[in-house]
Swiss-Prot record:
<comment type="similarity">
    <text>Belongs to the universal ribosomal protein uS4 family.</text>
</comment>
<dbReference type="InterPro" id="IPR002942">
    <property type="entry name" value="S4_RNA-bd"/>
</dbReference>
<keyword id="KW-0699">rRNA-binding</keyword>
<dbReference type="Pfam" id="PF01479">
    <property type="entry name" value="S4"/>
</dbReference>
<dbReference type="GO" id="GO:0015935">
    <property type="term" value="C:small ribosomal subunit"/>
</dbReference>
<dbReference type="GO" id="GO:0019843">
    <property type="term" value="F:rRNA binding"/>
</dbReference>
<comment type="subunit">
    <text>Part of the 30S ribosomal subunit. Contacts protein S5. The interaction surface between S4 and S5 is involved in control of translational fidelity.</text>
</comment>
<dbReference type="GO" id="GO:0042274">
    <property type="term" value="P:ribosomal small subunit biogenesis"/>
</dbReference>
<dbReference type="InterPro" id="IPR001912">
    <property type="entry name" value="Ribosomal_uS4_N"/>
</dbReference>
<feature type="domain" description="S4 RNA-binding">
    <location>
        <begin position="96"/>
        <end position="156"/>
    </location>
</feature>
<dbReference type="InterPro" id="IPR036986">
    <property type="entry name" value="S4_RNA-bd_sf"/>
</dbReference>
<protein>
    <recommendedName>
        <fullName>Small ribosomal subunit protein uS4</fullName>
    </recommendedName>
</protein>
<dbReference type="GO" id="GO:0006412">
    <property type="term" value="P:translation"/>
</dbReference>
<dbReference type="Pfam" id="PF00163">
    <property type="entry name" value="Ribosomal_S4"/>
</dbReference>
<keyword id="KW-0694">RNA-binding</keyword>
<keyword id="KW-0689">Ribosomal protein</keyword>
<dbReference type="InterPro" id="IPR022801">
    <property type="entry name" value="Ribosomal_uS4"/>
</dbReference>
Length: 206
């Protein structure tokens, strides 16, 4: 299955929430009406079954993190085999992806842009170049921008945008050096309350 290449705002409208797929330099509210799903007759929302609600939540989270269906299922199986809450384990695995951590640290405006930086070998983990977006980051790992990539205007622009975001407790970023430390796994309370991981667990448990 190929990665989605269509209009990104259409995905946000489909899920009824900002999936942070665009740069953030303009308010997404000025670009589209999130409360209206895409399509000519998008204003009227159909009544959804329990299964449809669970499926929509899974699609929302999958698109938020930019993960394809097959990889998402692998994460769920791994989360279900681990100790603790399956839903929280799933979110932790998604948060530990290198492309997500690069985005969280502000080196990329979006997770998609962060994946490009990784594939172009602009990102290092513990001083080693890693070009795998799904690479799992562990506590105390150091993520940095490669020296030859530090003058890229898109990275500088992303860091400027990051200054406007809320500081995250589980990572520490040195903007001047363009590097950061993944201090710990994020707790559930650290992450978005708009995600209902229990619906995803119910979907895959059937």
């Amino acid at each position: 299955m190929a990665r989605y290449l269509g209009p990104k705002l259409k995905l946000s409208r489909r899920e009824g929430t900002d999936l942070f797929l665009k740069s953030g330099f303009r308010s997404i509210d000025s670009k589209c009406k999130l409360e209206h799903p895409p399509g000519q007759h998008g204003v009227r929302k159909p009544r959804l079954s329990d299964y449809a609600i669970q499926l929509r939540e899974k699609q929302k989270v999958r698109r938020l993190y930019g993960v394809l269906e097959r990889q998402f299922r692998i994460y769920y199986k791994k989360a279900s085999r681990s100790k603790g809450n399956t839903g929280e384990n799933l979110l932790q695995l998604l948060e530990r992806r290198l492309d997500n951590v690069v985005y969280r640290m502000g080196f990329g405006c979006t997770r998609s842009e962060s994946r490009q930086l990784i594939s172009h070998k602009s990102i290092k983990v513990n001083n080693n170049i890693v070009n795998i977006a799904s690479y799992q980051i562990s506590p105390n790992d150091r993520i940095s921008v490669r020296d030859k990539s530090k003058n890229q205007s898109r990275i500088k622009a992303a860091l400027e945008l990051t200054e406007q975001r809320e500081k995250l407790m589980w990572i520490e970023v040195n903007v001047t050096k363009m590097e950061g430390i993944f201090k710990r796994f994020p707790e559930r309370s650290d992450l978005s309350a708009e995600i209902n991981e229990h619906l995803i667990v119910e979907l895959y448990s059937k």
